Amino acid sequence: MAVRLRRVKRANPYDLYRTCATGDCPQDVKDRFEHNTIADKILKWGSAGVFLGGLGIGSTQARPGLGTYSPLGRGGVTGRIPVRGPGSTRPLGRPFSSGPIDTIGAGVRTSVETSVTVPDVVAVLPESPAVITPDSMPVDPGVGGLDISAEIIEEPSLTFVEPHGPEDVAVLDVNPAEHDRSVYLSSSTTHHNPSFQGQVTVYTDIGETSETENLLISGSNIGSSRGEEIQMQLFSGPKTSTPETDAVTKVRGRANWFSKRYYTQTSVRDPTFIQEPQTYFYGFENPAYEPDPFEDSFDVQLASPSEPVQPELRDITHVSAARTFRGESGRVGISRLGQKSSIQTRSGVTVGGRVHFRYSLSTIEDAIEDAGEIELQVTNGSQGPSGSLQHTAETILSEGHDAYVDVDMDSVGSLYSDIDLIDEHSETPHGILVFHDEAETDVVPVIDVSYVRKPLSTIPGSDLWPTNINIQNGPVDVDLQDSILPGIIITDSGVDGTYFLNTYLHPSLHKRKKRRFS
């Protein structure tokens, strides 16, 4: 059994290079750490022939060399320029003297021996009082009836207090050093770009008209007219609802159905071929290959194929979907691609050309521009009083839009007389009272007691129809005040004859309840 050798990993290159003191370091590790590999040699040889100094390649700093651009200053940049203050007496030479500078140690308090002198405060009284009282007041005739009184304010008393405290108080006179560099003057400069910022001029003088920018608000008739009246002309209208702005690129090759190199161009006169091309496809049946040739169908005769109207439509086997097109003349039409089967070999291969069938739609002439007017045909063939209106309409259309004719409506007669339009009046009226409420609506029929219709049948002994009255054909007068009571009683709650929704049945019509004796 073969023993599989185990691959032993080599130590880290950093550890191997550290142990190379004896000279047994691998060559690849040595070249890597001493930068003596093939890549390092190529860089050394290339740098000897090509000088790339100053471009900052291989370093983190890059500076523009000769021939490069310098960045322009942007607008609104604030620069700090140190200048001397107004009270500075610093010489123009070195800021410090050439002598040694004394150092002050930390924690040492500076003391200056000075003598404190307290000034004497002397009270000086004012020579003139604060309030002046005149001897006499001038009389103003415009101010009458007013009492003017002068108020005298006493002078306040001033008390001066002598300062008390120790006399050995140190007073330090601290002056700014001559070499103080904390005094700066900040100046800013803003550059305006006239391409993006317009010049704004504010005029404070009101009514000044000597400037160049004058605003004159006036009508159309003030001043000289420098314009020119140009009459607008209408261009030709678009041929489609959404006109294409880009030019239509011409299609080449087999995608161009109008190419005579790939397709035979045929104009179709029958629109049926474009709408239903399957009517031009027909075939023959061979009885020898039918599954049941001896059925009872000998008397049925197969319809002979219809002969195409055009000879170019023969031998068509396949047609494509219809597509609209626009030819070079600008006319719109519908076209299809067809495949003919003129020759068929024994192996079943059909040979035939491809034909482009196109059907051009009729051109719609602009009757308004060519003829100037459109003649309206009479669609109503009735000969009656409406003939005068038709004649008037034709007269208006023939004379133009500016001619109008006043038509007297009373002059037009009616096909029916007023007597025929009057409805028949019924002598047996039956009114209906409708009581409407927000919640419900009740309809109560009201029968006129002066007219009674003849009933279908008379019930002897009934309260609805009396038996002792001789009812003849037609309406008769019946007195129902004593003999018949109405089934529904409507109470009259108003003086003016207004009926309310207060109805109830007559007590005689209520069903009698049987009493139960316990």
From Swiss-Prot:
InterPro entries: Late_L2. It is found in: Virion; Host nucleus; Host early endosome; Host Golgi apparatus. Interacts with major capsid protein L1. Interacts with E2; this interaction inhibits E2 transcriptional activity but not the DNA replication function E2. Interacts with host GADD45GIP1. Interacts with host HSPA8; this interaction is required for L2 nuclear translocation. Interacts with host importins KPNB2 and KPNB3. Forms a complex with importin alpha2-beta1 heterodimers via interaction with the importin alpha2 adapter. Interacts with host DYNLT1; this interaction is essential for virus intracellular transport during entry. GO terms for molecular function: DNA binding; structural molecule activity. The keyword Transferase does not apply. Disulfide bonds join C20-C25. Minor protein of the capsid that localizes along the inner surface of the virion, within the central cavities beneath the L1 pentamers. Plays a role in capsid stabilization through interaction with the major capsid protein L1. Once the virion enters the host cell, L2 escorts the genomic DNA into the nucleus by promoting escape from the endosomal compartments and traffic through the host Golgi network. GO terms for biological process: microtubule-dependent intracellular transport of viral material towards nucleus; symbiont entry into host cell; viral penetration into host nucleus. Keywords: Capsid protein, Cytoplasmic inwards viral transport, Disulfide bond, DNA-binding, Host endosome, Host Golgi apparatus, Host nucleus, Host-virus interaction, Late protein, Microtubular inwards viral transport, Phosphoprotein, Viral penetration into host nucleus, Virion, Virus entry into host cell. Belongs to the papillomaviridae L2 protein family. GO terms for cellular component: host cell; host cell endosome; host cell Golgi apparatus; host cell nucleus; viral capsid. Transmembrane segments: none annotated. This is Minor capsid protein L2. It holds the Pfam family Late_protein_L2. A motif (Nuclear localization signal) lies at residues 2-11, 511-517. Residues 68-100 are annotated as: Disordered. Highly phosphorylated. HAMAP family: PPV_L2 (MF_04003).
